Amino acid sequence: LSAIPDTPAAAGWRWAPAWVLAFVALWPAPGYAEAVMVLGALAAIARLLLLRFRGGMRLLSGPAWALTSVLFCSYWLPELLSAFDAVDRARALREAAVDLRYLPFLWLVAAAVADARGRRITFGGLGAIVALWTVDALAQALTGTSPLFWGIDGIKQALSGHPMCAVGEAARVDRLSGVLGPCNLKLGIVLASLSPFALYAAARRFGSVGWLLAAAAVGVVVLLAGARAAWLTYGLVLLLSGWRVLGWKRLLGVFVFGALALGLLAATVPQLRERLARTAYALSADQDGVDLALSGRTRIWGAALCMARAHPLNGVGARGFRDAFPACDPVPTQPAAWGTGPALHAHQIVLEILSETGVLGLLCWLAGVALAWRAWRYADAPARARARPALLALGVTVFPLNTHLAFYSTFWGGLTLLLAALYAGSLLARDSDPGAAAS
């Protein structure tokens, strides 16, 4: 499909990058981020209605519209199909209906990176957010306080009289929490998933030295944030972005330096040392040792397999894991490593999809992966260069040989869909921009 030339009618979408950056920047205040996303979705719908959909080609190329919509459907259709006989059918149907709000917002996200100006603002802005959050977390590591979270918490208390986090939650924190705060310990995995935007921006502006400095700063924060899934995610980012900037030999030196830095941090940070010691239990042949190393996840995965066997076609329903867990708990009489109450989700993308949406859901996800890869395979070199940061961020986020946050949750599902739309919009952009090549 050929794109209709740009006209002044499309100028209103110059604000699309601002919607995307505001959504991400407000993640420390989830309610406000959700409001920005909903308003962005409404703005997208209004814009399309005003143009009577004739302006669609001015905003996105035809293939970009199609790929963005298909990637959304590969996420949403499993949720819908699993709802009809879910453990809590009414809730599942309601959540599936509510999640339709993502589709117009994803069109807006893809439109934000549909031309060179939009990509420069959006990708550069995401890199700047990662840099700011990294500096803030390093300040917390040195002083014990996150300046950004301190400011957000002060505003919250001034407006509502209540802090962002309960006193007990703040007292129990055992890792770097940064701008997200002690009651939302996702800093490590969020920075790891978004780090390609910062690393590519640093390499493009300052060359290999910029990449090295950015990689070191983000790496220290990811380590101190304590999420071992984030360590693997960030390692993949370094591997897949670093070889293009440094070459294999120099990249090997980076990993050797990283191992030495890890040893130094472990010697000086008790919480990191404890996590490394717990991880070492995975080398034990004893199942209990492996379960301890994985913080009880083998028990959760056993329950997920039980759900998949009991509901093979369409699972127990998206977000229904916690309700179905007691019936599938392999050791219900033993105390759980995560504390009281049922496990909330499968902590692994394939098991989450199988247990909550069944084989039908897995086929939908695989179809989305296949179409995303097909688009990459047939894209030309400039298009691949444009989309490389978004593809890397999306790829490491859904990398199956890792543990994960819940993809059928508002926060992590929203982040994943955002990355998918950034990938589709930048790969199949309206322009042909060889100058966008990443380093």
PLM regions and their residue ranges:
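A membrane-periplasm/extracellular boundary helix in multi-pass inner-membrane enzymes
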Residues: 135, 139-144, 224-225, 242-293, ...
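Transmembrane signal-anchor hairpin modules in multi-pass inner-membrane enzymes, especially those
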Residues: 1-94, 111-124, 128, 153-154, ...
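Membrane-interface catalytic loops of GT-C/OST-like multi-pass glycosylation enzymes that act
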Residues: 90-94, 181-185, 225-230, 343-348, ...
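Alpha-helical transmembrane segments of multi-pass inner-membrane proteins
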Residues: 19-21, 43, 104, 120-246, ...
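Transmembrane alpha-helices of multi-pass inner-membrane enzymes
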Residues: 39-47, 238, 365-371, 390-402, ...
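Long extracytoplasmic/lumenal interhelical loops at the membrane interface
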Residues: 288-302, 314-357
